Amino acid sequence: MNSNVENLPPHIIRRVYKEVSTLTSDPPEGIKIIPNEEDITDVQVHIEGPEGTPYAAGIFRMKLILGKDFPAAPPKGYFLTKIFHPNVSNNGEICVNVLKKDWKAELGIRHVLLTIKCLLIHPNPESALNEEAGRLLLENYEEYASRAKLMTEIHAQGSTLRGKDPTDPCSSASATVVSGDGPMAKKHAGDRDKKLAAKKKTDKKRALRRL
């Protein structure tokens, strides 16, 4: 048996087993759990790319590793499928606040998975592990979307997952297209406009000081 399991208290093992069993039989929308009978601390997952994002139509394999200090310490998350995303490093490590500073012991695996799915809709360039993806997201969304979509088409093609989850905070945020009208495009177009306006204002002040 894996050492992580051996180091977990019996009541935590029961909690994890119960939650994984529930997630397997009643998964959130667009998420599928692949149970690991030999090691329940290694949670294998398939996540469907949300509509209205460059990840749409992709199936992404990932895993959560529950360490010996779980649930006092958060699980570690990794994408096993290659993905172009600001908050996912080249080795697949996921940077999301709920897995770090915002973690609480009462938060379960379902919450973590829904948060990671949300990250596909609303990336956070401020905590980028992939600096190139973070820069493009802020400065050139069309190029970012093109790169992310290409990676999805190459590495993440698969059949559609089934399932609905009314507690999914991101389910109502989906749209029908990737560029122009998708939730990511609208958000970052607004951010880009604000930054351009601020830059113009700063440039104008500098020009006036030179007069």
UniProtKB/Swiss-Prot annotation:
It comes from the Eukaryota. The active site is at 95 (glycyl thioester intermediate). Catalyzes the covalent attachment of ubiquitin to other proteins. Acts as an essential factor of the anaphase promoting complex/cyclosome (APC/C), a cell cycle-regulated ubiquitin ligase that controls progression through mitosis. Acts by specifically elongating 'Lys-11'-linked polyubiquitin chains initiated by the E2 enzyme ube2c/ubch10 on APC/C substrates, enhancing the degradation of APC/C substrates by the proteasome and promoting mitotic exit. Belongs to the ubiquitin-conjugating enzyme family. It comes from Xenopus laevis. Residues 11-157 form the UBC core domain. SUPFAM superfamilies: UBC-like. The keyword Transport does not apply. Residues 158-211 are annotated as: Disordered. GO terms for molecular function: ATP binding; ubiquitin conjugating enzyme activity. Residues 197-211 have a biased composition (Basic residues). Its EC number is 2.3.2.23. Pathway: Protein modification; protein ubiquitination. GO terms for biological process: anaphase-promoting complex-dependent catabolic process; cell division; exit from mitosis; free ubiquitin chain polymerization; positive regulation of ubiquitin protein ligase activity; protein K11-linked ubiquitination. This is Ubiquitin-conjugating enzyme E2 S-C. It catalyses: S-ubiquitinyl-[E1 ubiquitin-activating enzyme]-L-cysteine + [E2 ubiquitin-conjugating enzyme]-L-cysteine = [E1 ubiquitin-activating enzyme]-L-cysteine + S-ubiquitinyl-[E2 ubiquitin-conjugating enzyme]-L-cysteine.
